[in-house]
UniProtKB/Swiss-Prot annotation:
Broad class of where this protein is predominantly found: plastid
Entry GO terms, CC: chloroplast
Gene: matK
Pfam families given in the database record: Intron_maturas2 (PF01348), MatK_N (PF01824)
Similarity comment: Belongs to the intron maturase 2 family. MatK subfamily.
Gene Ontology process terms (BP): mRNA processing; RNA splicing; tRNA processing
Subcellular location: Plastid, Chloroplast
GO molecular function: RNA binding
Protein name: Maturase K
Amino acid sequence: MXXXXGYLEFDGARQQSFLYPLFFREYIYVLAYDHGLNRLNRNRSIFLENADYDKKYSSLIVKRLILRMYEQNRLIIPTKDLNQNNFLGHTSLFYYQMISVLFAVIVEIPFSLRLGSSFEGKQFKKSYNLQSIHSIFPFLEDKLSHFNYVLDVLIPYPIHLEILVQTLRYRVKDASSLHFFRFCLYEYCNWKNFYIKKKAILNPRFLLFLYNSHICEYESIFFFLRKRSSHLRSTSYEVLFERILFYVKIQHFLKVFVNNFPAILGLLKDPFIHYVRYHGRCILATKDTPLLMNKWKYYFVNLWQCYFSVWFQSQKVNINQLSKDNLEFLGYLSSLRLNPLVVRSQMLENSFLLDNVRIKLDTKIPISSIIRSLAKDKFCTVLGHPISKATWTDSSDSDILNRFVRICRNISHYYSGSSKKKNLYRIKYILRLCCVKTLARKHKSTVRAFLKRLGSGLLEEFLTGEDQILSLIFPRSYYAYKKLYRVRIWYLDILYLNDLVNHE
């Protein structure tokens, strides 16, 4: 962080958020290369090598493009001529791709510095991978069992491009950068619409920047109001809807209730709220009454409609009662399960039986949606009956077997945190039988004859992996009694959703 801050010491421009001069600074490209700002892009950096065009280029080309843009406006080309205009051996699509990535890299610098400064002085567990999707579930296991309601919110996206420009104005102060951003944004949409039929690969870094800036502005307002409502221990939700002199009103409001209704004061305390954002959605978990949850719901609707000028319907905010409803969360169906327990209490010569209830987070596999995904990819029918994969019969036996084993292991790895493994075993069974039918079809034989000829050793690859590893971790007596069926294990190396989750 100190080295990144040293790069940006130029005439106080960093303090004023003047980013446009950075387009002409050579060390910015060195910073992008040395400090790994291109990690958000799963491909290689566009400043080093572009796999689509197989060309290498440097910051000098970027400077020439910007100068030419101001001199003759030749970058503003009609959509139908996008592939016909060449400059330095590249098409105009290459210009937009390169400049949009450059803009994203430069604007990421103050965001990265601000994010890094917020983490200074805070300690995180080294073994806790915050990038992993599965890192959310241990947190929810500890917290959701104490709550009863969850708001499931679909985060809307701005329809008009000027909303994104206005959002960036709060972060970037110089007009040159804003004008340049507006130009990149509109031209980017022009060639995106032209190439959408050809399924061209869009610039993921620029899209991630737009998404993160939009989300950052929304969450900054939400967390500000959430923090304000937590300053006073005994407050009501009036602070979120009527902010004028709310401290005086709340104090007077509490004074009345303390004098007249002391027994009800505990019901007015601001509950503890947990907020989690994932995959274009966010959830708000709290222990509230239905009335207060409805207030939170319409608060989100008014926030998006009034502040961001985005049409946001109340149907996009679902109120789930965890004890009755299932919450679709990252490919799992989560709910609260009540486990009744009987505790025997002994007091001198008298003994009592106490009924107790233990609340646990139940994570289940949505078997119906996964079967639809498998049926869509021709692994089984819509009823879950395995069929042969006809398109793979041209491959070798080892390739076919390796493909099925890889898919089966990925699914087992992702859904290792399910409370009950019955549905997971069913998915494995479908893939195993589909593999056998595919191999039997290739060799023009029946499944029974094929297995009889090769033996059961063919499917041993499916069995090696998670089950055998877990049998080594836990004691043999633990594994012998099949308690492993209820063990949930969350892997902290999963960074992306499983393909079968995105069945929609």
